[in-house]
Structures are given as structure tokens and as C-alpha cells.
Amino acid sequence: MAITSKYSNKQIEQMLTEMVDVLDKHRAPADLSLMLVGNIATNVLNQEVPAEQRQIIAEKFAQALLSSLDKPKTH
């Protein structure tokens, strides 16, 4: 989602692969996968981000998510 990151692509891809493997192992459908990812994001925000910064970080996260979605193809 991020254009620039302090984390390497290799590190990100490795962790993403491991997380997707867990979802695949449990045959999680899209709605359950999204629920879990949303809960992880909420937990990280609540546990790791100072209360006064949570709203702005959540808004930036939501904007980054929306901007990273594939756009529907139009004919």
C-alpha cells in the first residue's frame, strides 16, 4: 500500500505470504479474511498507537487502502 517504506519488499512479501498461508490453511472466505485483517488493524491501532494519533492514522490507512484497490475496467 505504501509508496515508500522503511521495510524491505522482501520482508513485506515474506510476512504477507505467511499470513495468506494461514488464511488458506483455514479456507477462510473473503468476508472472514477481511474481518480478521480489520481486527488486526484495530488491535494494532489500539495497542501500539497513542490515543491522540489513532484517528488520523486510521484515516490515512483507509485512504491508502482505497487508493490501492484495482479500478474496475470500463469498456
Swiss-Prot record:
Coiled-coil positions are: none
Q: Which Gene3D superfamilies match?
A: YejL-like
Q: Which Pfam families match?
A: DUF1414 (PF07208)
Which family does the UniProt entry place this protein in?
Belongs to the UPF0352 family.
| Name listed for the protein in its UniProt record | UPF0352 protein VF_1649
The organism's lineage is: Bacteria, Pseudomonadati, Pseudomonadota, Gammaproteobacteria, Vibrionales
